[in-house]
From Swiss-Prot:
Region (Domain I): 1-63
Species assigned in the record: Phocaeicola vulgatus (strain ATCC 8482 / DSM 1447 / JCM 5826 / CCUG 4940 / NBRC 14291 / NCTC 11154)
Subcellular location field: Cytoplasm
Gene Ontology biological process: DNA recombination; DNA repair
One cellular component term from this protein's GO annotations in UniProt: cytoplasm
Family note: Belongs to the RuvA family.
Sections of the chain in a coiled coil: none
Protein name as annotated: Holliday junction branch migration complex subunit RuvA
Region entry Domain II, spans: 64-142
UniProt-listed InterPro entries: DNA_helicase_Holl-junc_RuvA_I, Hlx-hairpin-Hlx_DNA-bd_motif, NA-bd_OB-fold, RuvA, RuvA_2-like, RuvA_C, RuvA_C_sf
Region (Domain III): 148-197
Length: 197
């Protein structure tokens, strides 16, 4: 079993990274959270989950043990596979996801691509008690669901979702940009968001 892989970043995209470890390149699936954490590094260490199936051997990598722990909790829920769990962890940071589950915010959870209302409710029911003991610090889901600059926020999120980005991921990125630059016009917010999504 692989616990972690440490090596040079040979290639990186928002969804995958190739780590060169002693001349061997490991193709690893990553979330947007992990991408944000490692994109400017030349060398990194990723905590690994191995998904071994009849037709594939897939590696998922995480910049923190907490993110991997949440991934394992998510795939323990009936109907949630590795790619869906990675999509959820791309849309919400570990602390945000814990906040959403703790507060039972199924509306925000179902904005993640591929998650319907029933699945969102199942995640909350199955994981609420486990999240309470996970040790990940939670963020109040209302904090990023309703940022102050709502008009520009809503306009930018609408534009990004029309371009095919997941609503939850778009909301998160736009909220972060408006926190950094509260006076930014909507065009600038969208341009900055496109670089981060």
């Amino acid at each position: 079993m692989i616990e972690y892989i440490k090596g040079d970043i040979a290639e990186i995209t928002p969804a995958t990274v190739v780590l060169d470890c002693n001349g061997m390149g490991y193709g690893i699936n990553i979330s947007l959270n992990t991408y944000s954490a490692i994109q400017n590094q030349s060398n990194t260490k990723l905590y690994i989950y191995e998904a071994i199936r009849e037709d594939a051997y897939v590696l998922y990598g995480f910049s923190t043990k907490q993110e991997r722990e949440l991934f394992l909790l998510l795939i323990s829920v009936s109907g949630i596979g590795g790619n869906t769990a990675r999509m959820i962890l791309s849309a919400l940071s570990p602390s945000e996801l814990c906040g959403v589950i703790s507060s039972g915010n199924d509306k925000l959870l179902k904005t993640v691509k591929g998650i319907g209302l029933k699945t969102a409710q199942r995640i909350i029911v199955d994981l609420k008690d486990k999240i309470a003991t996970s040790g990940v610090e939670t963020v109040n889901s209302e904090m990023f669901a309703n940022p102050g600059n709502t008009e520009i926020h809503d306009e930018a999120v609408a534009a990004l979702t029309m371009l095919g980005f997941a609503q939850a991921a778009s909301q998160k990125v736009v909220a972060a940009i408006l926190k950094e630059e509260p006076a930014a016009p909507v065009e600038k917010v969208i341009k900055l968001a496109l670089k981060r999504l």
